[in-house]
Design a protein with these regions (language model features):
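Core SAM-dependent methyltransferase catalytic element
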Residues: 206, 212-236
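A short acidic, Gly/Pro-enriched loop at the edge of an enzyme's catalytic core
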Residues: 109-120
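A short glycine-rich, Lys/Arg-flanked "PGG" loop and its adjoining helix->strand segment in the class I
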Residues: 134-149
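Hydrophobic beta-strand segment of the Class I
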Residues: 27, 121-122
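Conserved alpha-helix/loop element of class I SAM-dependent methyltransferases that forms part
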Residues: 26, 35-56
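C-terminal alpha-helical "lid/dimerization" subdomain adjacent to the S-adenosyl-L-methionine
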Residues: 156-208, 212, 218
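Class I SAM-dependent methyltransferase SAM/SAH-binding core
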Residues: 57-110
């Protein structure tokens, strides 16, 4: 079954932008509902791995409504949140208390910063949405400082076949239903499974990071691999 919002290639960005524009106002509510609030715990693990010290520079890509960016800022980092969805950034801007973080509209495949700019580069639920996840990794590596931490939270593919089948059924049935009830848009949430089918997931991302000469590349799985963090450090 095709999905309104999933298209391969160059049209991908425009379609994903339409998707997030359609759900921005209810995005946080539906995240809480479909993950039973667990996404907040997973994001706290991202923040812990970031090991923020006062004054470090952090970039949160595909920042959405700002959960990760705001948490990094609360711990003393100087944070830039980047997303290409203006409606999502509008929600993020309403949530911030002061000048930090700075939220900007931009493309994670063409990050508007010089090489070696950030101590911490994070991305939550963004990598599988990019037209090229490999190019996304390359851009994250480029803007990270030597020794900088790169941390990616994303939907995963469980290794256990039975659990994977049950999980994919949940994504196919329950999640779009939640989207329809609370957002009037089932297709936007059916997109999660469609995009995940085309995404190689956590083990392939870790292998690619090692191939790119990241150090300390590792995977932290949650819920038997249904969610995962890819963590690595830029060599140098």
């Amino acid at each position: 079954v095709s999905n309104t919002f999933y298209v391969p290639g160059e049209q991908r960005a425009a379609k994903v932008n339409d998707l997030f524009a359609s759900i921005a106002r209810r995005y946080d509510l539906i995240n809480d509902l479909q993950s039973f609030g667990l996404h907040r715990h997973w994001k706290r693990r991202v923040i812990a791995l970031a090991a923020v010290t006062t004054g470090v520079r952090a970039l949160d890509l595909c920042c959405g409504t700002g959960d990760i960016a705001l948490s990094l800022a609360e711990r003393g980092a100087e944070v830039t949140g980047l997303d290409f969805s203006a409606p999502m950034l509008a929600v993020a801007g309403q949530r911030k208390r002061g000048a930090n973080p700075i939220f900007i509209q931009g493309d994670a495949l063409k990050i508007p910063f010089p090489d070696n700019s950030f101590d911490i580069v994070t991305m939550g639920y963004g990598l599988r949405n990019l037209a090229s996840w490999e190019q996304g990794l390359a851009e994250m590596q480029r803007v990270a400082k030597p020794g900088g931490r790169v941390i990616i939270l994303e939907f995963g593919k469980p290794a256990n076949a039975l659990w994977r089948s049950l999980y994919f059924t949940h994504l196919q049935c329950s999640v779009p239903l939640t989207g329809w009830i609370f957002c009037g848009n089932s297709q936007a949430y059916a997109y999660i499974l469609e995009s995940l089918k085309h995404y190689p997931a956590q083990l392939a991302v870790a292998a690619k990071m090692r191939e790119m000469n990241f150090s300390q590349a590792r995977v932290i799985n949650f819920m038997g691999g249904a969610m995962a963090i890819n963590y690595a450090v830029k060599a140098g």
